[in-house]
Each structure stands twice: as C-alpha cells, then as structure tokens.
C-alpha cells in the first residue's frame, strides 16, 4: 500500500474509533442510572420548560413520582403547574410541588406565594424547597439570615400541608450552608455519581439530561431512598427514608 493510502486509512480508522467512542459515551450518559434493585423508584422534576407533557406516557415509562415547579420568590408562578398537577395525579403518579427559594424576598412572602397556588391533598408528596445559587439573585446572606428566612417559609408551609418539607440542595449550597440547614429530609443533587456521605438523603437527583416518554427534550431524573411502601408512608406524612 502506498504511503498516502496508508495514512488515509489510519486517519479514517482513528476517526471511526473516535466516533464510536463518542457515541458510546453519549449512550452511557443518557442511560446511566443507579442500581435499580437498591433504588427501585424513579422520579422526575419538571417545570414549564418541559412544555406540554403526556403524563400517561410518563407513568408508563417506569416513573413513580414527580415534583412540579409551582412558584419562585414572592410572586412568580409556573404557568404549567395547574395542568401538570391535575394531569399527573390523574395518571396515577405520586405528585408534589416545589418552590424555588430566592434570597431577595422574605420567606413569609414566598410561603404565601406557594400556599396560594398548591392544593391541600392528603396524598400529595411533602412540599419541597429548591435551595441553590444558580438562577438566584445576587445576595449571599450569612447563615443566620438564610436560616431565619427559610424558617419563615417553612413554618406556614408545613402547617398548611401537615408534612415536613423536603429540602433540595445543590453541592455548592450544601457546602455553604450545611450547618445552618434545619433537620429535614434532603433532596440532593449529584449528577452521575452517588451523593457523598456527609448527610443522608431521601431523594437523589442523579441526571439532568435524561429522556422520558411523554416529554420532548431533556428532563431531570431522581430516585427515592426507599421502596414503594416507604413512599406511600411518606406521602401520608411519615418520616422520609433517609431523613436526618
């Protein structure tokens, strides 16, 4: 074989190998999940960014629970929440609502925003609070002020729904405020690897670009720390598996 042909052949082989490796890596990324025997219950969290959702298709695609964004700050409401809440419940999913907590509005004001939008349903999942820096305002309160405003949100919210709230925390937020967090079940974000052992968790968000039937585009995936019976008890107000 002439040298130019050999070079071309090797170049093609390397390119094909790189393409195959990239394809395999993408497949692994899109389909990676925790041990299903250990964590059998899979869930999603969504907002208006996922658009119109076919909830029956979601329920048929091995999804057991869902958290829906309902509110943010003191006055923002997710425009798809009411439809998502009604349709996801009708599809037989365990459904909860979450609030994106902002540092720039009083906690009590944010609680009113959440409570005014979320129905009181005995079988709903506990209310959840999204605590993170991404997408938040520029303020970075000290631990005492953050805790005071979070408590101002939690007190009326938990009194209204009769269940301890679930706290969603990113690694960055957890590092900054770990010692100031109240003793509540944690929903920990840890993409493609298990959360560290610093604190137990009830819900683990393990993927942020997954695909689920009934949803156009990527979606977050989660697992619950217990089995179906434990999830049902948690819906009823019992202590979450993995709660601190």
Predicted regions and their residues:
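Structural recognition of alpha->loop->beta junctions
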Residues: 115-129, 133, 178-201
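Hydrophobic membrane-insertion alpha-helices, especially the h-region
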Residues: 6-27
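Substrate-binding cleft of extracellular glycoside hydrolase catalytic domains
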Residues: 36-51, 70-152, 158-160
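Functionally critical loop-and-helix segments that line ligand-binding/catalytic clefts
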Residues: 35-51, 56, 181-244
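Boundary/entry segment of secreted carbohydrate-active catalytic domains
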Residues: 20-72
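N-terminal Lys/Arg-rich, disordered targeting/topogenic segments
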Residues: 1-5
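Aromatic-lined carbohydrate-recognition surfaces of secreted/lumenal glycan-active proteins
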Residues: 158-175
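Structural preference for beta-strand elements that scaffold enzyme active sites
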Residues: 41-43, 64-65, 94-96, 124-128, ...
């Amino acid at each position: 074989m002439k040298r130019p042909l050999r070079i071309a052949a090797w170049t093609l082989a390397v390119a094909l190998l790189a393409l195959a490796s990239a394809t395999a890596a993408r497949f692994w990324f899109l389909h990676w999940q925790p041990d299903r025997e250990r964590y059998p219950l899979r869930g999603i969290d969504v907002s208006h960014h996922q658009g119109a959702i076919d909830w029956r298709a979601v329920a048929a695609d091995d999804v057991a629970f869902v958290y829906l964004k309902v509110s943010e700050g003191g006055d923002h409401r997710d425009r798809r929440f009411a439809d998502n809440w009604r349709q996801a419940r009708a599809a037989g999913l365990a459904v909860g609502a979450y609030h994106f907590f902002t540092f720039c509005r009083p906690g009590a004001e944010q609680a009113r925003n959440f409570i005014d939008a979320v129905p009181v349903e005995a079988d709903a999942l506990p209310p959840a609070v999204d605590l993170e820096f991404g997408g938040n305002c520029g303020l970075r309160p000290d631990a005492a002020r953050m805790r005071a405003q979070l408590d101002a949100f939690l007190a009326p919210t938990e009194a209204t729904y009769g269940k301890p709230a679930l706290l969603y925390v990113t690694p960055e937020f957890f590092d900054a405020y770990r010692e100031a967090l109240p003793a509540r079940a944690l929903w920990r974000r840890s993409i493609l690897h298990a959360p560290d052992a610093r604190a137990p968790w009830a819900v683990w968000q393990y993927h942020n670009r997954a695909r689920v039937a009934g949803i156009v585009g990527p979606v977050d995936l989660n697992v619950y720390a217990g089995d179906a019976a434990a999830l049902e008890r948690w819906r009823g107000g019992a202590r979450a598996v993995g709660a601190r």
